[in-house]
Amino acid sequence: METKQKFHYAWIILAGCCILQGASLGLVNNCAGVFFSPVCEDLGFEMGQLTFYRTLYALSSAAAMPFVAWLLLRADVRAVIGIAALLFGGSTAFMGLSSELWQWYAAGILQGFASSFLCTLPAPILLGNWFQEKTGTVVGIAAVFSGFMGMLGSTGLGFVIPAVGWRAGYVIQGLLSAGLIVPVAVFLLRYRPEDMGLLAYGAKEAKPKNAESWAETGKKEKTKKTEESGRKSETIQSMNGSQKGGRLLSQPAFYMGVLIYGCSCAGAYLNSFLPSRGIEAGMALSAAAMLTSLALFGNMFSKFFLGRLCDSFGVILVLAGASLAALAGHVLLLFDAPAVIMTGACIYGITMPLSTVLLPLFCRLFWKGDAYGPAFSCVSMVGTLIASPFNTWFGSFYDWTGSYGLTICVSGGLILFVFLTVCAAGRLVRRSPLPGK
């Protein structure tokens, strides 16, 4: 007798992760650049001075990353993410009440600390726990919402700021972010399916037809679980050894992951300067803000396919192709024609999924099970530290040269380095067979 398959709670987790990434990474982080020019013009700050808060944001985020996987594993995920959402939204709204640089710097530190528990780490970890199948696809779907919400947010703020001012814009942004995330964290999110007495999506139990097959299947399952437990134990011991004795630092994959994350994350910082690039090219603020929307459209559109392509062709090939496409977008941003800049912004949007979608899947090639969270946190932490100065440097390049040409070239060079590192990683994977694709 066949039973109708029940709806799996993993899809609720996916919906929660979509809102989590959309309301944090999308609505706040991806829209930060819309405020740069209005704030600098109103308060007389230099671009490099204001954008230094983004460097402090990145440093604070990196400092918190080692604790994310540890806390999610040991504490109630609802409390961790809920408290982080209140801190994240509150620090964003506080910027609307600020008039001195130090206030942005203080808010940036708080915002960065909270972002580690919201923006990039929790969703891949939770989805990896809940989905045994289609992991790449669902990570990509969740990441799509950061682009979707960023696209809506940047477009909306492009009209809100001229109408009611940048101060009200910050307050609205912060309240919306916290208001969307907190209910999701409290009522929907759970760390792993075992917490609810469930199996992960795709982890199906065998259903033999007779007692003999039941016994035989039980033996096979026991043997399989023993082997998997042994592999998992070895992986966890390896990961523990890396934390205590520096074994992680001896793995080439760690350095490759750090370089890919750091360079792609730094290249993604250029997104914050796209509205200013549009103003430099003679576009009105509402039109220039659309450049961020176009970049986030490219970001969102590419995420629909990147995760699925990874499931089909492997993350190495997809990561290499995506980095070349992102590099082409950088080249188009160097031209002054508005239509070319808009096209370049859209293609440039592929830069952001390099770190938010593809790097988490890249890390799953090398670290499995409970070892994945700590390893991914370490890779993200060191990569974020590498990327952190580029927010300030990108703004300072404009202060020094009066043009965003140098900023775009440096960002493009970083993406080229991502491509070269991925090629090296591909050779490493071919030489050393790994569990998984």
Residue map of PLM features:
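Interfacial helix-cap and linker-helix signal at transmembrane-aqueous boundaries
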Residues: 39-40, 71-72, 155-165, 278-279, ...
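Paired small-residue
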Residues: 91, 102-110, 339-347
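C-terminal transmembrane helical hairpin of 12-TM major facilitator-type secondary transporters
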Residues: 293-299, 305, 310-362
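Extracytoplasmic
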Residues: 12-38, 43-47, 64, 154, ...
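Helix-loop-helix hairpin linking two adjacent transmembrane segments in secondary transporters
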Residues: 145-195
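Conserved MFS/SLC helix-loop-helix module at the cytosolic interface between two early adjacent transmembrane helices
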Residues: 63-101, 310
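Intracellular juxtamembrane helix-capping segments at the cytosolic ends
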Residues: 117-131, 354-367
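Extracytoplasmic gate region of multi-pass secondary transporters
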Residues: 28-36, 246-304
